[in-house]
Amino acid sequence: MKSLGRHIIAEFYDCDKEILDNVEKIEQSMKNAAYETGATLVNSSFHRFLPYGVSGVVVISESHLTIHTWPEYGYAAVDLFTCGDDVDPWKAFTYLKEVLKSQRVHVVEHLRGKYDEIGIPENSPHKMEV
């Protein structure tokens, strides 16, 4: 089934707690994850909370990647939303699982903007002229 985008919602458990609390490492890892998908990086914003935790977003031309970490629990919540046929959010998922040293994951994928539900013909390109 064709869709405008793919949205991976991932729960990373039993991660490296030091990595989860390192805002520079998390930001660089999220940018690298965007590059792994084949996406075009637009901007990013990350914040380290006190006493611990990091939240951040990487905006890509094809949508966004976000992360929220709870180092005290070894846990990270990650959204990987990409649009178009040229990017693969699963590459970002695989990369982040390795970088965060996650021992256990729960992940689901949602198709966003399903062609048949919007009324777009199945053979239509993603980018139509307006």
From Swiss-Prot:
Coiled-coil blocks: none
Residues modified to Pyruvic acid (Ser): S63
PTM entry text: Is synthesized initially as an inactive proenzyme. Formation of the active enzyme involves a self-maturation process in which the active site pyruvoyl group is generated from an internal serine residue via an autocatalytic post-translational modification. Two non-identical subunits are generated from the proenzyme in this reaction, and the pyruvate is formed at the N-terminus of the alpha chain, which is derived from the carboxyl end of the proenzyme.
GO biological process, one term: spermidine biosynthetic process
Active site: S63, H68, C83
Site (Cleavage (non-hydrolytic)): E62, S63
The protein's enzyme class: lyase
Key word Hydrolase present: no
Gene3D superfamilies: 3.30.160.750, S-adenosylmethionine decarboxylase domain
Gene Ontology MF annotations: adenosylmethionine decarboxylase activity
Catalyzed reactions: S-adenosyl-L-methionine + H(+) = S-adenosyl 3-(methylsulfanyl)propylamine + CO2
Quaternary structure and interacting proteins, as annotated: Heterotetramer of two alpha and two beta chains arranged as a dimer of alpha/beta heterodimers.
NCBIfam families for the chain: SAM_DCase_Bsu
Protein's name in the database: S-adenosylmethionine decarboxylase proenzyme
Lineage per the UniProt record: Bacteria, Thermotogati, Thermotogota, Thermotogae, Thermotogales
Gene assigned in the entry: speH
